[in-house]
Amino acid sequence: MTTMTTMTTEQLGMNNSVNDKLDVLLIGAGFTGLYQLYHLRKLGYKVHLVDAGADIGGIWHWNCYPGARVDTHCQIYQYSIPELWQEFNWKELFPNWAQMREYFHFADKKLDLSKDISFNTRVQSAVFDEGTREWTVRSIGHQPIQARFVIANLGFGASPSTPNVDGIETFKGQWYHTALWPQEGVNMAGKRVAIIGTGSSGVQVAQEAALDAKQVTVYQRTPNLALPMHQKQLSAEDNLRMKPELPAAFERRGKCFAGFDFDFIAKNATELSAAERTEILEELWNAGGFRYWLANFQDYLFDDKANDYVYEFWRDKVRARIKDPKVAEKLAPMKKPHPYGAKRPSLEQWYYEIFNQNNVTLVDVNETPVLRITEKGIVTAEGEAEFDLIVFATGFDAVTGGLTSIDFRNNQGQSFKDVWSDGIRTQLGVATAGFPNLLFGYGPQSPAGFCNGPSSAEYQGDLLIQLMNYLRDNNISRIEAQSEAQEEWSKLIADFWDSSLFPRAKSWYQGSNIPGKKVESLNFPLGLPTYISKFNESAEKGYAGFSLAS
């Protein structure tokens, strides 16, 4: 195996070509990739990172649409690296995209990350050579990079999805996908704005547009069962009070299902009286954030009656905020549209109140579907509505889209699209049979979409780094997932998924938002602590489930 050493700054300047073979090439400069870069470099690996964007931050580099912000409270939406949290102060409890960029730039300065990153480097293809046991990675406008191992940290939102609507190319106004928003911003003041989609970005954009746009029309297929954010501005004194509590909060992240510092209640909703249930639900509601979703009764995502209790409480709270009963029925129907919590809820600040404004209209596309787009606007069965700006808040080809968008080829000439055509198969959510020496973080069949991003970045990052150290210490130059092991991993996920209420919601969690995509759990839904335990079980047995060769 090639000796692993650290390259100098002169050898790997920012945006310079990589002129030597690497031990590890990292793809993606979000929380996960940067964490691995920092620690692998400290451990003496010859490592470099490439990213398609012009700056670090991953999703927070690309997402700068109006209202874009974190849906996790700032205390745990950060690295647990002491030199960062001890010095950085947050301005809001739920930071917006601009604050997140400030945080990443602060981390870059403190940890000296950019010297080992090539920006504006979008990976197009990669081919594995069995003879050299190396990947050759190609991107437009750059020299090929050779690396013993590649770790792709592409996130679950790397591949935006825009619906195929007839006539979009004829529209004379502006149109954008929220994930590809112009970095210079877009002025919505005084404009007629259409927002297609009511996922998290749709909710956030709608709130902001309603403040000063002339007219806002929200096209909704499924209502977002959003929760109150309870935003708060933070002073220097607030930050000072928070800091002593952070180490314990970081420690709790690895012990809670979704990598937060709170977890489900060890009580069943069906076993409590109505008064007891209401008291608990009221407390969760008033706490704000995701507690109503992820600190609720332990049975509500598995038992339909328990789920009804949770939904009905939410419904009644929301309907009280909406003046028009017909609009209330579309936004918070008397009968739940799907099990509550089976789709990721957005956190909102004044979303439901905007529909009481004269300049905001809600269109249910189940009743009046979008037929086409014209040069002036959008046509439904009720006629044409004219717009100056169309916003596609239509989400992503989530979780797998980042990997399938790159033409990774093994020495049988297969791509991820080929081997996953009948469903995802991975071992521990980090590798797929047929692709030796290619690992991925925050990817398919990992906690990813069910986990706080920084928690996943650190815990899974540590597990991958321990794996890399094992390979180095034992002179192993080739690792590949075993087919039998990944079948067992996939069955574990499928069995749990099918025992829950999640399959009853058409969601990106199972790929049902993308036409033609196989419907299956894209993530590991058994929780972060179980994931860590399963990974460690493999490690204790010399990484059982992988084929290793010197």
UniProtKB/Swiss-Prot annotation:
It comes from Comamonas sp. (strain NCIMB 9872). It holds the Pfam family FMO-like. Belongs to the FAD-binding monooxygenase family. Homotetramer. Pathway: Alcohol metabolism; cyclopentanol degradation; 5-valerolactone from cyclopentanol: step 2/2. This is Cyclopentanone 1,2-monooxygenase. Disruption phenotype: Cells lacking this gene are not capable of growth on cyclopentanol or cyclopentanone as a sole carbon and energy source. It catalyses: cyclopentanone + NADPH + O2 + H(+) = 5-valerolactone + NADP(+) + H2O. FAD binds at F31, T32, D51, W60, D71, Y77, V123. The record marks R344 as: Transition state stabilizer. Keywords: FAD, Flavoprotein, Monooxygenase, NADP, Oxidoreductase. Its EC number is 1.14.13.16. Catalyzes a Baeyer-Villiger oxidation reaction, i.e. the insertion of an oxygen atom into a carbon-carbon bond adjacent to a carbonyl, which converts ketones to esters or lactones using NADPH as an electron donor. Converts cyclopentanone to 5-valerolactone, a step in the degradation pathway of cyclopentanol. Besides cycloalkanones, can also act on methylated and other alkylated cycloalkanones, and on methylated cycloalkenones, with high enantioselectivity in some cases. Cannot use NADH instead of NADPH. Gene3D superfamilies: FAD/NAD(P)-binding domain. Its cofactor is FAD.
